[in-house]
Amino acid sequence: MKKFLSLLVCLMLTLGLIGCASGSDDKSADTDKKESSDEATNDELKGHLVIYTSEPQDLVTEMLEDFVSKNPGVTYELYRSGTGDVKTKLSTELDAGGTDANVLWFADLGYMYDLDDQGLIYHYSPESAKDLPDTYKYNDGMGHEVRAIYSVLAYNTTQIDKAPKDWDDVTTDDYKGSLAIANPAYSGGAMTTLSVHVEPDNESTVGWDWYQKLADNDVKMEQSNGTLLTKVASGEYKGAVIVDYLPRNSKNEGSPIDYVYPESGSVLIPTPLCLMDNMS
C-alpha cells in the first residue's frame, strides 16, 4: 500500500500539482519535479497505473512517458475521452463491481465529491501541496487542482476587428451563425460553464437568457473544446466559448486567434486530480 501510494504521489507531482502553488515559478517547479523523480528512481518504484482523464491526450501521454522513462518499473494504461464519457465508463464499472482506475483527472468536481461520499476516494496530501491556495485543495486531501483553467471567449483575428469584452458581445449580429460552444454532455468544461452561468447569485451568472440569445443567434455546437479551437483558427467560426489554454497555445504558435477573459467574470473550470481508494 505505502509503496504504491508513493508511486501515485510521484505521478501527481509529475502531472504538475505544484504548478498551482502561490509564489512558485518554472525553475522551482522543475527542481521539485526532478527531486521527486530522483526519489522515485532511487526507491525503484514498480507498479501498474490506470489513469482516467479528460485532459488532452498528447499532454497526458507526454507527462506519463516522461515519468516512466525515469521509472522503468512502472507501466500504465490511459483512458482519455470527454468528461461525460469518462464518468459513464467509471460509473458503469463501479456499478458492475469495481474499477481498475487508480488516478482520476477530469473536469467534474461535483462527481468527485459524490465518489468521496461513497468512500471511493483515497485522501492524501503530499508535502508539495502544502503551499497550494485553499481554493485548489478539496475536502481534506480528497483531491488537488493540477492547474487553473478558465472558460473564455476566443475569436478569429482575421474576421473580428473589435475584440469582445463580455459575454453579451458575442450575441450580436457580428457572430450570427458563427459562434460555437462545446457540448455540455461531453465536455466537463462546457458543463461547468453552463452550471455557473445559470446559478443564482453567482458573480459570473449570465442566466438562461444569455443562452436563449445564443440560440436566437444560431449558435453552433461542437463535441469538444479541441474541435472549437480548430474551427475558430481555420475561420469556420468567428468565435467560441472555450477553455483558455487552447487559444493561448494556438496564439503562441502563430494561429490567427486571440481570446479575452470576460469583464463580468470568467468561469473557473475545476479539474481535480484524485486517487481511487483501490490500491493494493
What are these regions (language model features)?
Residues 2-23:
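Sec-dependent N-terminal signal peptides of Gram-positive bacterial secreted proteins and lipoproteins
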Residues 18-35:
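Bacterial lipoprotein signal-peptidase II cleavage site
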Residues 41-46, 50-75, 85, 250-251:
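Short, polar/charged alpha-helical segment
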Residues 53-61, 83-84, 99-236:
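Extracytoplasmic ligand-binding site segments that recognize negatively charged/polar headgroups
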Residues 89-96:
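Short, well-structured alpha-helical segments in soluble
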Residues 110-114, 233, 238-256:
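A ligand-binding cleft/hinge motif common to bilobed small-molecule-binding domains
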Residues 149, 211-214, 221, 253-277:
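Periplasmic-binding protein-like
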